[in-house]
């Protein structure tokens, strides 16, 4: 039994040592230059140096990251296609029931990579200087304020 276990461990470590034997693609579901893209490229550079192998980012922007997630879900499960995603992946699963993939079934999270802040910003000359003032303004002028977001349902 011990010999079989040792043999199995040696075979596994041999297979592990050979990965990656070819370039690794990281799918990013947002445009080049976005914060997700920038962090993804830093990660690709570091993984490439660590593995001594080419690791590149492929941007598949659109549909709040769902185009890239769908491509990752349909890629072979060989480790040569990775998805760099953010919280939109979980939000999409809850908000969009007819996605062409099932994140829980088709994808597997392997590591948290970065934490980025989400901040609310207004133009410098906008009268509201805090959230309470912004809420008061929105209530006093229903339907007059707009916002921009890269998220689901934007």
PLM region spans:
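Hinge/capping helix and adjacent helix->loop/strand transition within the periplasmic-binding protein
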Residues: 74-79, 94-154
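Sec-dependent signal peptide recognition
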Residues: 1-7
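Short, well-ordered beta-strand elements
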Residues: 22-31, 55-56, 81-82, 108, ...
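Short, polar/charged alpha-helical segment
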Residues: 36-52
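Extracytoplasmic "Venus flytrap"
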Residues: 26-40, 61-63, 149-154
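Residue-level signal for nonpolar/aromatic packing positions in well-ordered secondary structure
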Residues: 24-26, 33, 40, 57, ...
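Sec/Tat signal peptide C-region and signal peptidase I cleavage site
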Residues: 13-17
């Amino acid at each position: 039994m011990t010999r079989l276990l040792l043999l199995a461990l040696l075979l596994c470590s041999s297979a592990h040592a050979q990965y990656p034997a070819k370039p690794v693609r990281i799918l990013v579901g947002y445009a080049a230059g976005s914060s997700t893209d920038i962090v993804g490229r830093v990660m690709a550079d570091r993984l490439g140096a660590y593995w001594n192998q080419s690791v590149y980012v492929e941007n598949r922007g659109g549909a709040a990251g769902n185009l890239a997630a769908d491509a990752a879900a349909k890629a072979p499960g060989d480790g040569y296609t990775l998805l760099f995603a953010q919280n939109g992946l979980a939000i999409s699963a809850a908000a969009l029931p007819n996605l062409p993939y099932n994140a829980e079934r088709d994808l597997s999270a392997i590591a948290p990579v970065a934490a980025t802040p989400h901040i609310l910003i207004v133009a410098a000359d906008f009268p509201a200087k805090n959230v309470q003032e912004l809420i008061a303004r929105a209530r006093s002028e229903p339907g007059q304020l707009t916002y921009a977001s890269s998220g689901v349902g934007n």
